[in-house]
């Protein structure tokens, strides 16, 4: 399917960036008002789209739940606590499938535990945005473009104590929206690229009590601003996520997990008079994003999203999952329920499925599904 893009904006980059932001995050903007809720709109938003089916089924919560290979995305510190020595996963998400048929997100991840409470991992995150047809202001075709974005990530996790671990991701990100296209009166487009880092902590309060609590904290996509050509510089989606998970082993075969994640984009809030955002530096934008909302602390709180999730695991083989994601109306109004199942075979191979059901009737995210295939090998080395 080919999607037409009319180059009518003053800046081609701004038009494309807003299109991608609104589709990728499913934001609802008030008709006739440009970003009336002052929604932060960084570029490369695919970096904040949930890649795996397990967390997707739990309301997009994952920073504090038990570790698996997809901890590379949610909280790499959890890799040091993984109960397997080696793991791999492949995930597939057809994106906006109610609107188009050629957009998809792919993710490949793997990790290896080593001695002394350490682990190393990698992931490849690829977002195929399909074929776009650009047109000039007069409607003349300016060519077809296959828009794509990807991130290559390497991870390291280390236990600092029996309960606390630290994680680090280093990643290369590339965003190619329209190749080298140049419209009338605009600078030539070029792929945006950058190097970014993630930092995370994971605390596992292991105990013999009825409930076990785990905590996670993650600051992701720490990087400079990027450009698609010309003088404009754009923030990438630096993100702060904190969460807690409560785990109860009902008996030898039944296990319950409940989790809560709070999430905030650490980029400047666009002002009432300047909907394009701030000219501050990337680091200044991270720290300033906690205090820059024009309506004060109340508006800052509205920029947090909430993810609630639950998982029932039977005999470490079959899982039922559910969750709810909530975003305030002013800052995007994404609200949806999530459901999913998981299946393990021979304690080595796994299959996860997730399905999204929005609360509204016109969400572009309606009927989003995700599929993940996993493989893991038992850890035969003594735990440190």
Positions of the model-derived regions?
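Subset of outer-membrane beta-barrel
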Residues: 27-384
């Amino acid at each position: 399917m080919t999607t037409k893009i009319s180059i009518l904006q003053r800046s081609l980059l701004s038009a494309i960036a807003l299109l991608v932001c609104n589709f990728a995050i499913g934001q609802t903007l008030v008709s006739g008002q440009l970003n009336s809720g002052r929604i932060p709109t960084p570029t490369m938003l695919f970096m904040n789209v949930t890649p795996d089916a397990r967390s997707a089924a739990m309301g997009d919560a994952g920073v504090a739940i038990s570790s698996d290979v997809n901890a590379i995305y949610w909280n790499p510190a959890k890799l040091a606590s993984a109960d397997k020595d080696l793991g791999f996963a492949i995930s597939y998400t057809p994106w906006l499938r109610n609107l188009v048929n050629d957009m998809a997100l792919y993710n490949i991840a793997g990790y290896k535990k080593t001695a002394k409470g350490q682990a190393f991992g990698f992931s490849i995150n690829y977002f195929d945005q399909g074929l776009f047809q650009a047109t000039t202001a007069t409607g003349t075709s300016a060519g077809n473009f296959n828009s794509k974005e990807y991130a290559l990530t390497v991870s390291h996790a280390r236990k600092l104590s029996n309960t606390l671990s630290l994680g680090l991701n280093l990643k290369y990100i590339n965003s190619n929206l329209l190749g080298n296209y140049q419209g009338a009166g605009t600078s030539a487009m070029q792929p945006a690229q950058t190097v970014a880092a993630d930092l995370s902590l994971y605390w596992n309060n292991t105990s013999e009590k009825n409930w076990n609590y785990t905590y996670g904290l993650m600051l992701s996509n720490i990087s400079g601003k990027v450009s698609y050509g010309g003088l404009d510089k754009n923030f990438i989606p630096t993100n702060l996520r904190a969460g807690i998970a409560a785990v109860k082993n009902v008996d030898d075969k039944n296990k319950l997990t409940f989790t809560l994640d709070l999430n905030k984009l650490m980029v400047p809030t666009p002002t009432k008079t300047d909907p394009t955002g701030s000219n501050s530096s990337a680091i200044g934008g991270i720290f300033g994003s906690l205090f820059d909302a024009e309506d004060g602390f109340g508006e800052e709180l509205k920029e947090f999203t909430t993810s609630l999730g639950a998982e029932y695991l039977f005999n470490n083989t079959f899982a039922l999952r559910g969750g709810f994601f909530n975003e305030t109306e002013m800052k995007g109004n994404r609200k949806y329920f999530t459901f999913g199942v998981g299946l393990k075979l021979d304690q080595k191979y796994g299959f996860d499925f997730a399905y999204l059901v929005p609360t509204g009737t016109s969400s572009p995210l309606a009927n989003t599904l995700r599929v993940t295939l996993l493989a893991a090998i038992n850890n035969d080395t003594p735990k440190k």
